[in-house]
Amino acid sequence: MSILQQLVSGIGVPNFGVILPEIIILITAFILLVVELLIRSRVVISAITVTGLILAAASVFLIKKGDVTFYGLYVVDMFSLIFKLFLILTTLFVVINLKPYLDSKKSYYGEYYYIILFALIGMMIMVSSPNLVTFYIGLELSAVSIYILAGTFRKDYRSKEGAFKYLIMGGMGTAIISYAIALIYGRTGSFDFYTIASLINSNNIDVGISGALILLIIGLALKAAAVPFHFWTPDAYEGAPTPITAFMAVAAKIATFAVILRVMVEAFPFISKEWSFAWAILAAASMIIGNIIALRQENVKRMLAYSSVAHTGYILAAIAAPTGMGFSALIFYSLIYIFMGIGGFILLSALEKNHNWSNHIDDFKGLAKRSPMMALFMLIFMFSMLGIPPTVGFMGKLGVFLALIGSDIWWLAVTLVVMSIVSAGYYLRVVIYMYMYEPVSKARLNFAMTEMFTVAFMAVFVLILGIYPTVFWGISTTLSSLLIAGIGR
């Protein structure tokens, strides 16, 4: 046996097969780098990106779950595979609608596509992280990529302002999380979630661990855009290209919630109940502030930005109920938010392409007469975000509500109901403007086929999952049970 073979056999070769989706996306990103320099064809670059994402999504089904690779730094369990699949599909729907939007703005930067893919890789690393080091690497890869995407409208001061605020607040979150990780490592001597869990319980929490947990919660809340760390959200969402806003509001948020759940269940399972009150306060503040400020918005895109802060509160409320039901509700709400969020923002993107459309609330006057189908789809998304049956948004809020009641957190359950009622003020306002007012313009509204397909697809699934939620709820319950049991490690 050669010296090289001896070294390899001694060290061990990581199982690269379990990261096949990540490899496909990485190769696609590097191909785009070369193609963008040589060809600069929008159609070719978009087609390559879509092909890579489809192949990556298909490869998820080829992976054997339960594998741990890279010396315990990367886990591929059912939880990570499901979230990876939905993150890839979310990115796919964003990408297919990016080209028509950029064409309408006469703005084209090929780097949009491969930076989105780098951000996606970071999110996929996040959801597969059983270790604070890999979690941090994935978090920063996705965050830095999104900083760039948020400021790609270089001549728009709103884009630059939003990106700058996001960069500053994101940098603060990075510093806070870094310090929290350092404190945890100093106390336990390990970055591994399960090792940390074996060394820390409710009987041996000292000042160092308490401080680390406070900092970790603050850092993660900042990344999730929870109140009072949400200040960057409306400006960053409003200034970014609307398909990118959809990516930021949905994919980045979902990946963050997946990480929060994995960290709390795997690294701190014995003290999650003691810290549930902190999550409950963040949830209540996000619901109250997000919904109240959304009431005052005249720009619908900015309104949906504050709405996303409120939805962060609904999801955090599920974390505040640290039970199997609560974790299932978190996973379920995270997955269904994809359909509501992508549908709503892509619909705005489609409308924004039209001449003199600024996403101001007055632009929606008479939309039902100018485009009956788009008005119907918008109504479905607004009803779902509000939580009106038979939409899936109702089932999501019902799951969180029942989890809170089961954990005797009545005050937060009441807050959820009251704030959902308050949110009717701005969700139904859009519906009233669409159906009860005369159009401000008679100009024809044009939409790309990909936009119509995406919006229709999301609207249909919002209704189907609202009427038949058992499949998604079953997936959520299974993932929650497996995560709590620690299966896959």
Curated annotation (Swiss-Prot):
GO biological processes: ATP synthesis coupled electron transport
What quaternary arrangement does the UniProt entry report? NDH-1 is composed of 14 different subunits. Subunits NuoA, H, J, K, L, M, N constitute the membrane sector of the complex.
Family affiliation: Belongs to the complex I subunit 2 family.
The regions listed as transmembrane in this protein's record are 19-39, 43-63, 78-98, 115-135, 166-186, 207-227, 241-261, 275-295, 303-323, 327-347, 374-394, 410-432, 455-475
| Alphabetized GO MF terms | NADH dehydrogenase (ubiquinone) activity; NADH:ubiquinone reductase (non-electrogenic) activity; quinone binding
Keywords attached to this entry: Cell inner membrane, Cell membrane, Membrane, NAD, Quinone, Translocase, Transmembrane, Transmembrane helix, Transport, Ubiquinone
Bilayer topology reads: Multi-pass membrane protein
User: What is the role of this chain?
Assistant: NDH-1 shuttles electrons from NADH, via FMN and iron-sulfur (Fe-S) centers, to quinones in the respiratory chain. The immediate electron acceptor for the enzyme in this species is believed to be ubiquinone. Couples the redox reaction to proton translocation (for every two electrons transferred, four hydrogen ions are translocated across the cytoplasmic membrane), and thus conserves the redox energy in a proton gradient.
Q: Does the keyword Membrane apply?
A: yes
Can you cite an annotated GO cellular component?
plasma membrane
Reactions mediated catalytically: a quinone + NADH + 5 H(+)(in) = a quinol + NAD(+) + 4 H(+)(out)
Descriptive protein name: NADH-quinone oxidoreductase subunit N
Biological source species: Persephonella marina (strain DSM 14350 / EX-H1)
Where in or outside the cell is it found? Answer: Cell inner membrane
Matching InterPro entries: NADH-Q_OxRdtase_suN/2, ND/Mrp_TM
Q: What is its EC number?
A: 7.1.1.-
Pfam families per the UniProt record, alphabetical: Proton_antipo_M
Matches recorded under HAMAP family: NDH1_NuoN_1
Q: PANTHER family from the xrefs? A: NADH DEHYDROGENASE (PTHR22773)
